[in-house]
Amino acid sequence: MHPFYTRAATMIGEIAAAVSFISKFLRTKGLTSERQLQTFSQSLQELLAEHYKHHWFPEKPCKGSGYRCIRINHKMDPLIGQAAQRIGLSSQELFRLLPSELTLWVDPYEVSYRIGEDGSICVLYEASPAGGSSQNSTNVQMVDSRISCKEELLLGRTSPSKNYNMMTVSG
């Protein structure tokens, strides 16, 4: 099998996890129909697969990580914007539906995110590299994020609370 097809096959789970995560924000706000959500998800999956196809390196998962990073920070990620346009969502509507600061890393074998510049990094998806070349031998598991990360999502925070005490130790 051609190496590109092997690489492309391995990114399916990672892309699906990232798209599902982003789509949940649209679903939670209830401003899109189920059909619009499906169209958005399918479009975003196709856009990400095309965008990543020459930047996916299962043998070196960190290589190309910056290129694959999905980022919202005062600017909308262009791929999310394109998928949203296909269902008629304007940039303004999209900014209301998604966190104002979101970083989503889509890497071979792991998808993780951070909401806010100071937020915790939470893992959405993990997989172990396959021993052989078969996709079936890959141990895949969706990770149920830590409670603190879930709470950030449910509370709609863009940054963690600054109400904390810092402990210092001097020797």
UniProtKB/Swiss-Prot annotation:
Domain of life where this protein originates: Eukaryota
A single MF term (Gene Ontology): enzyme binding
PANTHER family assigned: B-CELL TRANSLOCATION GENE, PROTEIN BTG1
GO BP annotation list: cell population proliferation; negative regulation of cell population proliferation; positive regulation of angiogenesis; positive regulation of endothelial cell differentiation; positive regulation of fibroblast apoptotic process; positive regulation of myoblast differentiation; response to oxidative stress; response to peptide hormone
UniProtKB keywords: Phosphoprotein
Source organism of the structure: Rattus norvegicus (Rat)
Gene name per UniProt: Btg1
Protein family according to the UniProt entry: Belongs to the BTG family.
Primary role: Anti-proliferative protein.
GO CC terms: cytoplasm; nucleus
Modified residues (Phosphoserine): S159
Xref: Pfam families: BTG
Protein name: Protein BTG1
Quaternary structure, from the entry: Interacts with CNOT7 and CNOT8.
